[in-house]
Amino acid sequence: MFVFRPKDLLPDPVYPADLKELGYFITDNDQIKKISDPEQDFQFKINRNPRWNEAQREAMNACIRTIVHSRLRDQGMTTLRLPLNASPKEPHVPIFISSNLSTAKRVVVVFGEPIQDVGIWAYRSVGMQGINAGSAVSLAQEILHLQKKDDQQQQQQAPESNGKPQHVTSDTALILANTGQLIWHCGGRRAITHASWMALPRRSAVDPPYTMTGRNSIPGNANWQEHVESVFEEVLAAKGRLVREDAKIDIIGISEGGLGAIRYLASDWSSWSPYINAICLASPLHFANIDLNPYDNDNEAEAETETNNQNNPNSFASFLLARGRAYVVSPEPRGVPVPGIEDHGCNCFASGEELNIECVMGAAWKEMVQWFEKVHADPEYCEDQYDVTTVEAEGGVVPEGGVQVVHAGVDNEDDNGGVAIEV
């Protein structure tokens, strides 16, 4: 039997977290392109061995994280550690908060996907559409009402900006939760995602990944559901300290992040109903007949369940139907109603993204912010209920996908007779 000695094993590949050394640069359009071929995006597959590909991707992602976090800080955002009593060297998860959080009348909270780093919508969008477009930078600029920098200035300041953070004058604050970086890397003393954990340096290229133990768990943030609860209970519930007593909260939930928020609010809606203004979901994963009811089996949960239905105007289900909406993958133009209200308990709209679920937020965030403004301006706002069905066209000719007939009404009462939309 042949045995390889450790010194004879392939060394683990190492790539620098530097765009130029990786062979890439930021264009005038804020996109990441190859230096050798300015028309080519990031090339993931550079070797038949997947370990080389993963190591290079993690180095690129580290560059992007540095740039995005630098730009967020330039806009007056800072990091907050959870648990709140954790020191920088103790296990904690960082979230981003705007500097006006304690004084703002409105707070927009974003719960992202567990597969993404904080502040990143999708790495594929960052490379192809632009760093700001694929991250929370554009959203922060819009919500905090900051004057946007031109791409050239941001490029000169990346990856580390020497510019002073802009002063936030808006009465709307922003919180970027961190449902992805929930693994504590003891050696690096930082929280990382599962993808980053798998890309950590190893003794050789053929060694297995490190085994996780209890030391890699973050107290109160062991998974994305716990992290969502931690943001609500440690940050948003800190009335008079971290947020204003009368602050209204808008929630953006992306995939599992939205599912966690829905489950938490459904389990304790009576406590949070005075403060939640509206909910907007990207790629919703909850089901109205399951997740809109509390998932605990104690007496309080049973009492919530009795009142948490659409027939009760004070229930969470009624609130989500009236002041909630979702954006999903669809071939339809952005903003067109699509089927989904029966599954998710709220109106569903096309996001403008046809293929990738992770790209929905980057495509639909502007619509979300505009809708939040509309709902905030009208305390009595109530969404029309869109019943979208697909029917055959007249004469037996059926276009590809059929024809969608959208009925808009309140309390299942049709108020417009239906609008036909070719799909």
Annotate each language-model stretch with its function:
Residues M1-N100:
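Basic, amphipathic N-terminal segments that precede the first structured/catalytic domain
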Residues G258-S270:
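Short glycine-enriched nucleophile-adjacent loop
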Residues L84-R189:
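Short, surface-exposed "cap/lid" segments of acyl-processing enzymes
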Residues I249-A261:
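Gly/Ala-rich beta-loop-alpha elbow adjacent to hydrolase catalytic centers
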Residues M1-S36, G352-V423:
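Long C-terminal extensions of eukaryotic subunits of large macromolecular complexes
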Residues G134-V137, Q141, L176-V243:
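Alpha/beta-hydrolase active-site loop
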Residues W269-G401:
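The feature captures the conserved acid-bearing segment of alpha/beta-hydrolase catalytic domains
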